[in-house]
């Protein structure tokens, strides 16, 4: 199981500092949406320059202009980009085709999907490399969205990542679903000792 840490605050220097501390305990560094909004592709470039051997994931939430957007983030050093499931199939397919030509992978964000099962079923044929099931950030901290897990996992052979405001309190419930990856943010990035917290989750995930 992969561990992905999301940096989703506007302070790029602080994000890079924390990333350096947790680097031994993470498989993928995510440049979060707010970091991208604030700094643009420079945030992706900064992470790639600081951690050239790490997988860099840009949570850019592409919904239009797929070819241009993917190219922009690929040139900045992203290894993964996100495309929204609720956008048109043409946008998803174009994004995936462009990504493949640039050696970049696409994770389909199911947040705005009209039908989770249908999105999961069609994703592979559109060129998607993985799926993202997560709890919207503004919703209350519950794991009720995990009730939809079987609907997604049962309709795809692609890897599925879970992002759920993961903490020590709920990590076991998330792990019990056996996702291919977990995405963790503020419980590590806001911790007094980010490295210690990252190590805790990394060692837990390594058992699955």
Enumerate the predicted regions with their spans.
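Conserved N-terminal beta1-alpha1 strand-loop-helix module at the mouth
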Residues: 1-67, 75, 126, 168, ...
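Conserved anion-binding
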Residues: 3, 65-68, 72-157
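Hydrophobic faces of well-ordered beta-strands that scaffold small-molecule active sites
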Residues: 3-7, 29-31, 56-60, 81-83, ...
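Short, ordered loop/turn segments at secondary-structure junctions
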Residues: 10, 34, 61-62, 85-88, ...
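Well-formed, non-transmembrane alpha-helical positions, independent of function
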Residues: 21, 46, 72, 122, ...
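Generic secondary-structure signature for well-ordered alpha-helical cores
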Residues: 24-27, 49-52, 79, 100, ...
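Alpha-helix-loop-beta-strand connector modules within alpha/beta enzyme cores
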Residues: 37-60, 94-112, 145-168, 199-208
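Active-site/ligand-binding-proximal alpha/beta "capping" segment
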Residues: 129-199, 204
């Amino acid at each position: 199981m992969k561990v992905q840490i999301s940096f989703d605050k506007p302070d790029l220097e602080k994000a890079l500092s924390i990333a350096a501390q947790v680097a031994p305990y993470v498989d993928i560094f995510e440049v979060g949406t707010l970091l991208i909004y604030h700094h643009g592709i420079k945030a992706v470039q900064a992470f790639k320059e600081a951690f050239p051997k790490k997988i860099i994931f840009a949570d850019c939430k592409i919904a239009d202009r797929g070819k241009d957007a993917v190219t922009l983030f690929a040139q900045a050093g992203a290894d993964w980009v996100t495309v929204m499931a609720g956008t048109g199939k043409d946008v998803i397919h174009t994004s995936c085709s462009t990504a493949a030509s640039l050696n970049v992978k696409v994770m389909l964000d199911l947040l705005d999907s009209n039908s989770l099962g249908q999105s999961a079923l069609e994703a592979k044929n559109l060129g998607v490399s993985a799926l993202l099931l997560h709890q919207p950030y503004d919703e209350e901290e519950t794991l009720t969205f995990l009730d939809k897990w079987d609907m997604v996992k049962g309709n795809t052979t692609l890897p599925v990542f879970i992002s759920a405001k993961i903490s020590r309190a709920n990590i076991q419930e998330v792990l019990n679903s056996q996702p291919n990856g977990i995405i963790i943010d503020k419980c590590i990035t806001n911790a007094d000792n980010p490295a210690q917290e990252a190590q805790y989750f990394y060692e837990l995930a390594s058992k699955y």
